[in-house]
């Protein structure tokens, strides 16, 4: 009898050890599932790019915004997902020695006002009211689709703003201001209305860090060109145009973005380091406490690129129709019968590099360790209840 009790205790101890080991394995699987859950599950990217300044001497603010616009388009975000707001038309300004151009580099090396620029809000349309309406979706029904931010709860949104500001405010066209409280409340409305998944806010203005101090909504990451009490300085004066071409912070951010491609694994921590005080003169700042993910795990392309990897080309492609594919028999009584085979135009496209989309994560299922742990628990309860002498009835 004593031997049977000893064997029963030993079996119970063994089952308990197995249960703990299997439980730890199950816990590790659950942690992996949780990590996958907190990855950005966005399905689309949007950009709202805003220049709030008028007049020729603010040429650099328009160039800032158009440079960011050029970068996000190059990385795959289409015009249909970009809301571009320019408070003044520098390309057609009478003082512009090169009409229909806006340059961001010295000696007129890079024209950021190309043939395909689509400005959604221009001149006096760029107001605090219109900006807040775009963010919150409170716009008249007659507003065209191109002027709407049609985001949802799976959208990652980049919001870039540049202009003149101060401690807790940003000026719009020297006639009105938006405060950091109004901006924070607008972002909260967006969160409550499920208009974004994650939001990246970048502002290039004097005392820019004051604009994100009042943020309180989740999943927001913010960057600014200067701390409270600091000015954000301009860069690259051009004697031919007579004004500075860009601001320092945006200039170095754009230099950084020029090295990014749609398949890049560069993360947000790298973006935080692009403009040290030795280059910017001001002290750039960032805020990540509201953001759920670690910035080192957030790719630059999660905000600046397209979810669907695309390759942009300016080459004109002439697609040839295959005569064999085009052959199809039409019924006498049906005039619009579909072709027998689809045209395989994709094979003719000059794809330089195929960028594979990450496979979709499988639906959650109980990990293997969980099942093993459950069996160990059943065995331990059996030993406790009946003892080892009943094992012969099982086997």
UniProtKB/Swiss-Prot annotation:
In this UniProt entry, which residues form the Cytoplasmic topological domain(s)? 386-395
- Tell me which Gene Ontology terms the entry assigns under biological process: attachment of GPI anchor to protein; GPI anchor biosynthetic process; proteolysis
Q: How does it sit in the membrane?
A: Single-pass type I membrane protein
- InterPro entries annotated for this entry? GPI_transamidase (IPR028361), Peptidase_C13 (IPR001096)
Q: Which cysteines are joined by disulfide bonds?
A: 275-280
Give TM segment ranges: 369-385
Gene3D superfamilies linked: 3.40.50.1460
Q: A Gene Ontology molecular-function term?
A: GPI-anchor transamidase activity
Cell location: Endoplasmic reticulum membrane
Q: In which residues is Ca(2+) bound?
A: 79, 82, 118, 120
As for PTM, the annotation reads: The disulfide bond between PIGK/GPI8 and PIGT is important for normal enzyme activity.
What does the function comment of this entry state?
A: Catalytic subunit of the glycosylphosphatidylinositol-anchor (GPI-anchor) transamidase (GPI-T) complex that catalyzes the formation of the linkage between a proprotein and a GPI-anchor and participates in GPI anchored protein biosynthesis. Recognizes diverse proproteins at a C-terminal signal peptide (CSP) region that lacks consensus sequence and replaces it with a GPI-anchor via a transamidation reaction. Transamidation catalysis reaction follows a two-phase mechanism.
Name the family. Answer: Belongs to the peptidase C13 family.
Q: What is this protein called?
A: GPI-anchor transamidase
> What is the species listed in this Swiss-Prot or TrEMBL entry?
Pongo abelii (Sumatran orangutan)
